[in-house]
Amino acid sequence: MAFQPTEHPVLALPSQERMREFKKRGKKGLDELVEIFKKREELIQLERNDPFRYGFEPPNWGDADELWADASELLIQGGNRAGKSEYAAKKVIRMLTGKKNAKVWVLGMTAQSSIRDQQPLIYKYIPEEWKNLRKTKVQNVSYSQKNGFTENTFVFPNGSQCWFMNYSQEMRVIEGGEVDLIWADELVPLQWIQTLRYRLITRSGKLLVTFTPVDGYTPTVKEYINGMKILETKESPLLPDSVNVPGCEIGHMPYVAEGRKASSKIIWFFTSMNPYNPITEMEKTLKGETSIQIKLRAYGFAQNLTGNQFPKFCHVHLLAPED
């Protein structure tokens, strides 16, 4: 049976032209080509088996890491299937593996959505050798696809522990705890955000918020976006001909911003930034949609549609007194 290389969105196959160059060099060239294919297959298998160590990280993940280093809160708004939850899940595991006795909360909409969406991603990024640990007085990692993590928690050999909670619970479940990292995913209520901040003070923890703003300009979105300073923009091929957001040049959307507090940072993960998700399907789906929907679904940006007296007024119109 002929060898069939595994498809991969990042690890490209040698071009036909390059393979012909190897063939011209005879057996030595063909042997080198075989090694290239073999190494590629090995890398793909490593990524499948241990994505924590060998998974591909797109450039926007590195940009988010830089913001994270100097921020106490990071909001990642993203288009559909932009990879924001993948990033957050890996960030959770980095904290749990990198700090002894770390404490992390992972919050979602409901218990069911936590088992369906967040917990499989967290399990995916657990280092391979820790996925099937023998239970002891400390370590306990028990997961099933049907029920998620046993009792909505797990503990690593280094004493680090993660708990899963959701916004359908009474808010008192988050009173009194002290944690190093909180990941709040999808439509977190503002009242929860305001309470969660106090759970991070003692351990100098950080808050990571991720969602696609499908409900528009909610109080939580306003908490971060209102009064922000756009630091960087990127081209928006699906919206190329107009000023899409005040403070951006024509044909661009916000990419990085600073919130009203300098310790609060914002980054937008565009759907096109995730190589594992075919952007062509998103383009087909959004064809004929309004610019509001395109901004939201492809770029993760929620537009404030309330009747502001000066709707195009933003930080770029503010001048220092000497100006």
Question: What does each model-found stretch correspond to?
Answer:
Residues A2-D323:
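Phosphate/NTP-binding elements of NTP-utilizing enzymes
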